Amino acid sequence: MDRHRRIGAVAMVLIVAALASCGPFEFAGRANETARLHEQADAALARWAAAVAAAGGQQDFVPTEGMTGQVGDWEVDVGDNNKPALMAGLVESATQLPDDLPPKAEIRWNDGTTKTVPTISAAQALRDLRDEPESPCPECHPLRVNGARLSTATVQTSRGPATAPAWEFSLAGTHVKLTRIAIAAGDGPAVQPPPWDANNPSAGVRIDSATRTADGRQLTAWFTGAPDGAEKPCGEDYTAEAVESDLAVVIIVTAHSNPTPGGCTLVGAVRTATAALARPLGDRTVLDIMEGRPVPVQLAP
């Protein structure tokens, strides 16, 4: 009996020792990952500060998506050409577009705030549209613009959706119209993501958007994550923290996984995590930690 007790005691000591030896390594791994994420966030804040300085300190109007839009759907007989042609920037003018500058116009956000900005000519807007090709299409026929009028369009910005002045271009052979925000493309901050490194890819959870509380002291990040919480196999819970500067905020989202082994699906779901700020968000921009790009922020309902 004593022998059995001694064996059991030795086994228990070995188990405890094994668990103890794993603990520091696991803790160190998490600490290293946290330090890496904070370093990545600091680098994103530094790149944003440089971009704002290059833009003359302006970060009121920061689009978070392209400034080219489309009104209507392509007809069946032209869609196979026109959609890739637009993505390739193959748009030319079939008539002389005005190159004179229209009067200043107003950007209006959904929260009621406004900003008066200088606008660009129709000819310049078309040049800007062509200068942003997404993919080449050597076999496509160019779209031909046969008219332009100053209108408005909705654009996603770092402060949420905004209605902005826009040139609306009519096209030959289709009822579809193109829109281009009538504000110079280079007037706001333009930040480039860090170069891709296959041996050291960016860490963290990519943020799609965020909502803020009325007092601006909390940000809720919206992102794609595990469908279930950590109480289920393959599930994850998420926490968030904010790394702040005078110009921007980076949200770090940390996943807390269920360690139970099992087969997991690749299906994602919309998840959220909330971070508290040291001071109200104000006019600061919220950045994604993966690439340091601005994300749209709206007032929480």
Where are these regions (language model features)?
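Long, terminal "pre-/pro-" and other extracytoplasmic accessory regions
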Residues: 2-243, 248-272, 276, 285-301
